[in-house]
Amino acid sequence: MIATIGYFDGVHRGHRYLFEQLRQLGAARGLVPAIYTFREHPKEVLCGVRPPLLTTPNERFRLLEGEGELHVLSFAEIRRLTAAEFMQRLHAEGVQSLLMGYDHHFGADQLTDFRDYARIGRETGIEVLPANELPEEIVGHVSSSAIRRALLAGDVESANRMLGYTYSIRGRVVRGNAIGRTIGFPTANIDYAAEKLLPPAGVYAGRCRVAEHDYPTLVNIGTNPTVGNRSTTAEGYMLGVAGDVYGQQLCFRW
């Protein structure tokens, strides 16, 4: 196998550029491309704080499965391994080459120099290769942190450009206060994943898929203090949808 390692939140264009290199190098070497990722975000394990995420674990795994052979690790189980110990584990699992992202580091010894990883690789029997960064002239600097900043600033267009797809949240439709219906605007409130990052409060133009059809949707993110609901809500008014969608799984896309 030829492998790469990371959390890959959002599976954005920079990640997919890395995976493209992984597949090309694998084809040239006759090796199966493999992606090693973690079940938990490292900050959740190391700092006890779960950061807002661009993709839930299931969303992330689903996106990664199409990019290479997927291996999901528990970060809590490997957090104390040094880079050498971790590479020994990879070698035992059949990894012959390791492609490292241009800004990626791993191991409890917190090595920062690529030459150290290359040296350990030689000692372990793994060829360590540096990946190229996605050229900035294509879409500018791309990172999960930059996408989070764009979303938090309400710049969904920039976030989508860096992601390479439209940002979305999904969840089951739950009973709201039905106030929208009383003023002629029936809405669907979804019970979205708590770890999912939302843009700032406001009304956004988007789309929603219902029963194999896409509908233009006004998505309202915010609180509803007029009815005593202080939690953040995700509520969509789907233009042209008739009937009750309560209990259905919906996906709001921006």
Language-model features, listed with the residues they occupy:
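Residue-level signal for inorganic ion chemistry
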Residues: 12, 64, 98, 159, ...
